[in-house]
């Protein structure tokens, strides 16, 4: 699967998505992420255009704070298109509000924002309770282990910049193999060791 950003220029977005579809072919899932850039009616129109190009995932079509707007998109988006949000959730209460509002087809959570492994697993427990899939946002080395403990985890985001940083700063960062990350259960913690010399290169003394 491939995810691309949309929302900066709504008039150009359908043609950009079409170009991406032509580049990756019909056999690869295509996701789009608007980061809340669209208004409600604009997002609905874009959902129709994107669905015609085989887009299966529409992330933050409107602001993640607009739960009514997200519910509107979830109810009216074309069949087969998931509405996803949650990467800016910081507390279990935020995730619960989204789920109670019926605002998402897939809840996103990011352990670097929502209270670490414990916060992520609380979001996972809420997904269990509401029977909603969970997607991990970025930081694949961290989330690979957590997703193994989350029964409703659908996938995690393999974001190039995060992967590059993880490989630069840690020994033992997991390689992707045929779209999969396989944590080694014999290793403690997250299975990595810091490269302290690399950390020191970016140290700022105050």
Which residues does each predicted region cover?
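Catalytic core of soluble alpha/beta enzymes
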Residues: 4-137
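Gly-rich Lys/Arg/Thr-decorated short loops/hinges at beta-loop-alpha junctions or inter-strand turns
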Residues: 1
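Flexible C-terminal active-site loop/helix
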Residues: 135-206
């Amino acid at each position: 699967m491939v995810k691309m950003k949309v929302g900066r220029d709504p008039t150009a977005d359908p043609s950009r998505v079409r170009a991406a579809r032509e580049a990756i072919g019909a056999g690869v899932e295509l996701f789009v992420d608007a980061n809340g850039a669209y208004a409600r009616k604009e997002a609905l129109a874009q959902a129709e255009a994107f669905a015609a190009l085989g887009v299966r995932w529409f992330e933050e079509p409107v602001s993640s704070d607009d739960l009514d707007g997200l519910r509107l998109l979830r109810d009216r988006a074309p069949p087969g298109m998931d509405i996803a949000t949650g990467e800016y959730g910081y507390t279990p209460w935020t995730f619960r509000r989204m789920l109670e509002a019926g605002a998402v087809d897939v809840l996103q959570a990011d352990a670097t924002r929502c209270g670490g492994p414990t916060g992520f697993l609380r979001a996972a427990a809420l997904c269990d309770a509401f029977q909603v899939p969970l997607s991990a946002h970025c930081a694949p080395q961290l989330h690979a282990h957590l997703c193994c403990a989350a029964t409703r985890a659908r996938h995690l985001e393999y974001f190039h910049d995060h992967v590059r940083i993880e490989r630069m700063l840690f020994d033992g960062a997991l390689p992707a193999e045929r779209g999969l990350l396989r944590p080694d259960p014999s290793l403690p913690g997250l299975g990595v060791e810091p490269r302290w010399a690399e950390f020191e290169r970016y140290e700022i003394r105050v």
